[in-house]
């Protein structure tokens, strides 16, 4: 017997039918449909919003705000060392990274981190590097220009 993709089916009894709520007492979930009797949770759009604690001041309102989101970090792309291999040519700059679709067009800065391996020598211009990434590029015969 050969198995064909169009003949695949779950085993007999493996799948259970969906519960049809409010369809008679014989179904076991008729009338109130498993919602109990009255109350907010029994209504159509019943339930409380996320974070609601029954009327007491919620934790997100009791605790102070702190910190901030750096706008520079939002515009800085993190580039893996292995992604530099996608760049055509010897020079790696923000423009060449964008041209190779390694960095999004709206990014203003890029930072190369040590992840993966570099297969050829590159000259890195105007891109920040971690110490490990810089050592790996120089070990592969490349150089870093600020």
UniProtKB/Swiss-Prot annotation:
Keywords of this entry: Ribonucleoprotein, Ribosomal protein, RNA-binding, rRNA-binding
Gene3D superfamilies: 3.100.10.10
Region (Disordered): 1-54
InterPro entries given in the database record: Ribosomal_uL15, Ribosomal_uL15/eL18, Ribosomal_uL15/eL18_sf, Ribosomal_uL15_bac-type, Ribosomal_uL15_CS
GO annotation terms (biological process): translation
One Pfam family recorded for the sequence: Ribosomal_L27A
Sequence ranges of Gly residues compositional bias: 23-37
UniProt-recorded Gene Ontology molecular function terms: rRNA binding; structural constituent of ribosome
Top-level taxon in the UniProt lineage: Bacteria
GO CC, alphabetical: cytosolic large ribosomal subunit
Similarity comment: family membership: Belongs to the universal ribosomal protein uL15 family.
HAMAP family named in the record: Ribosomal_uL15
Annotated function: Binds to the 23S rRNA.
Subunit structure: Part of the 50S ribosomal subunit.
Name by which UniProt lists this protein: Large ribosomal subunit protein uL15
Organism: Acinetobacter baylyi (strain ATCC 33305 / BD413 / ADP1)
